[in-house]
């Protein structure tokens, strides 16, 4: 996979604090992409990629909105350079979507009956002892 060209502009102040974590997550992403998929179902081979993408986006979201540890300029830089998913962050800011695992789970066009994914069903409404896994990303329940 070719390296993505980043902007020529130097990153804002504070980048050196979050860069090691983002580099580590990028390395995990590369490992997940090259991981062999023998013995797994077709959909299971993408689950680690979705988890790492969620983890990287959640890291930047928490730094900016929860802990207020990075500046708006650095946050915008991370969004612009593709380190975080701005659409997923936009959903996390809405009530009821604070723990959303991925955007595919709320897209109704991907299902036969125009409904959300099984992981969006509250655990109180599911059968007791029933273990569910989302077919899109492997989530075990992100609605609460």
From Swiss-Prot:
A motif (Nuclear localization signal) lies at residues 2-10. Involved in pre-mRNA splicing process. The keyword DNA repair does not apply. It is found in: Nucleus. Belongs to the BUD31 (G10) family. GO terms for cellular component: spliceosomal complex. GO terms for biological process: mRNA splicing, via spliceosome. Keywords: Developmental protein, mRNA processing, mRNA splicing, Nucleus, Spliceosome. Identified in the spliceosome C complex. This is Protein BUD31 homolog. The keyword Nucleus applies. Transmembrane segments: none annotated. The gene is bud31. Signal peptide: none annotated.
